[in-house]
Amino acid sequence: MFSPLIDQLINSLRHLPGVGPKSAQRMALHLLERDREGAQNLSEVLAKAVEHVHRCQQCRTLTEQALCNICSNARRNRKELCIVETPADVIAIETSAVFSGYYFVLLGRLSPIDGIGPKEIGMDVLASRFAEGEIEEVIIATNPTIEGEATAHYISERAKAQGIKVSRIAHGIPIGGELEYVDGGTLAHAISRRQEI
């Protein structure tokens, strides 16, 4: 519709979650018409992030160092491990300020139909952490979806086999909801009222 380069920019912006064709077009035109300096800055920062941000070696969240700020913090409770689906879930729980343990990011959830099995969500790495014997409680904070519940059950069985106490965050979170969209108060209540499973 526009020039090939503008069309390419619009299509690239459509890859962002929640951005449809109209929003992508508005963003592209705004950056090109009214905020070229902002567009240049966005381009530079995005290129740096793509080059330097990678997965934490211990919890698999996003970081610029080998270990993220949480995993490298010796003051956190090493006996508690909260298991989440995405780095956005770590941010959501950290914002609630009610959890002081460590995290493990699955980077998804079990979904055999989509070809996502235990290996794809890092169960081999997680099983190794369980076997180390340092973790006393696992708090499962997967989303309350069918796949999230199946993933929680699978992880629960593996942790219990190692003698680890397992709890699931309480359901103050709406069924079918995503953790990154839940307000801090609701999330704080859900974590503080977690239940053993």
Swiss-Prot record:
Cysteines paired by S-S bonds: none
InterPro entries registered for this protein in UniProt: DNA_Rcmb_RecR, Rcmb_RecR, Rcmb_RecR_Znf, TOPRIM_dom, TOPRIM_RecR
Annotated zinc fingers (C4-type), start-end: 56-71
Domain Toprim: start-end pairs: 79-174
GO molecular function, one term: zinc ion binding
Superkingdom of the source species: Bacteria
Pfam families the UniProt entry points to: RecR_C, RecR_HhH, RecR_ZnF, Toprim_4
Gene Ontology annotations of biological process type: DNA recombination; DNA repair
Coiled-coil regions, chain positions: none
PROSITE patterns associated with the record: RECR, TOPRIM
Keywords, in A-Z order: DNA damage, DNA recombination, DNA repair, Metal-binding, Zinc, Zinc-finger
Primary role: May play a role in DNA repair. It seems to be involved in an RecBC-independent recombinational process of DNA repair. It may act with RecF and RecO.
PANTHER family in the record: RECOMBINATION PROTEIN RECR
Recorded family membership: Belongs to the RecR family.
HAMAP family hit by this protein: RecR (MF_00017)
Name of the protein: Recombination protein RecR
Organism whose genome encodes this protein: Saccharophagus degradans (strain 2-40 / ATCC 43961 / DSM 17024)
